[in-house]
Amino acid sequence: MSYSAADNLQDSFQRAMNFSGSPGAVSTSPTQSFMNTLPRRVSITKQPKALKPFSTGDMNILLLENVNATAIKIFKDQGYQVEFHKSSLPEDELIEKIKDVHAIGIRSKTRLTEKILQHARNLVCIGCFCIGTNQVDLKYAASKGIAVFNSPFSNSRSVAELVIGEIISLARQLGDRSIELHTGTWNKVAARCWEVRGKTLGIIGYGHIGSQLSVLAEAMGLHVLYYDIVTIMALGTARQVSTLDELLNKSDFVTLHVPATPETEKMLSAPQFAAMKDGAYVINASRGTVVDIPSLIQAVKANKIAGAALDVYPHEPAKNGEGSFNDELNSWTSELVSLPNIILTPHIGGSTEEAQSSIGIEVATALSKYINEGNSVGSVNFPEVSLKSLDYDQENTVRVLYIHRNVPGVLKTVNDILSDHNIEKQFSDSHGEIAYLMADISSVNQSEIKDIYEKLNQTSAKVSIRLLY
């Protein structure tokens, strides 16, 4: 069999078996007899074509807050220029740095506000190497054609395990006993120390973390209730309750796993603590705004709440250092640290080697796919658009990435510009005021790319344009 004949056979087989790569595609595995008919040098899967952007030189990536080395490797393997910093940057320095970068990677301490993003003249995308994205002005970023990606589940196991440890530690007052013995005090007591078996855990927010926590808790003999604003299938024997009050009334331990939104701000405050069981425990490893800490302090002082574990706070230090967690940062700090059976940790829920490595891979891969292919699946502020990767057989094919205001008539205008060429694939979607069109056009000569770019750049609804070829 000739090489070209094998290629034709491969293409025919891919079409017959529907190897489209699309999410809804159905395929079956080729039989071994078919595989044996192919020469060893022929691959069933075509090699994706490495695309390069028109009118852009080296891709510059700025990584802050000690983003994991797995991300650095992925970016450098792509040939990107990477600038790495272990901590966040002061606002004025960040404004200067962001002027010339195409992508920026941050964690939870860097704030990408409208003031900062106004200076991001080349920025294509933002990677939040964490779950939360409230540190980024998502709406403004979208209005400038900047896609934002995060890691919604890579640290789920690490956070869930931390909460399990805190449940046991609170029930046995391990924090207080450890502090006492560190200072030379031997205090062997059993009063108000409990097994967790048979107790009820109430989970507020049954997402990636809440559901994993549910499974781990049941394995230790806890009964699990959960409250969520949407109906979610329970894992194991966990049971969803219809109101937050019902969960609070019935739970021995209450743990929060919700995002920071206007609806979740001070989700647990004085009325909610009053609704809880006497001697219940509170755990917050989600966002610092969801628990009203002054009200929690009063509930602990009144012996209504027997203890709490907090990993997040309304205001957190910008960097590690002695004395940085103080009353200047949060006015109630001294009062909180003086209370018994209070476990305080410095936002370490996802701080494990495994989680950070996984987050680095997940977010860096998403950013690379968006930069290299225009794939926006997983973006938190942007339409989710994807097309199959181009391959090396498509020599004169250009991928058009056109971000525009979501107004009538845009597709007609764009397709009129592209009509001199064959539009092989096209996908468009919208997200609020922003829409995103991705199209592959063939039979494009190198000399025509600039003309296409300039015509698209003159359209009135344009937010940003990239051409990959």
From Swiss-Prot:
This is D-3-phosphoglycerate dehydrogenase 2. The modification N-acetylserine is found at residue 2. The keyword Oxidoreductase applies. Residues 399-469 form the ACT domain. InterPro entries: ACT-like_dom_sf, ACT_dom, D-2-hydroxyacid_DH, D-isomer_2_OHA_DH_cat_dom, D-isomer_DH_CS, D-isomer_DH_CS1, D-isomer_DH_NAD-bd, NAD(P)-bd_dom_sf. Belongs to the D-isomer specific 2-hydroxyacid dehydrogenase family. It comes from Saccharomyces cerevisiae (strain ATCC 204508 / S288c) (Baker's yeast). GO terms for cellular component: cytoplasm.
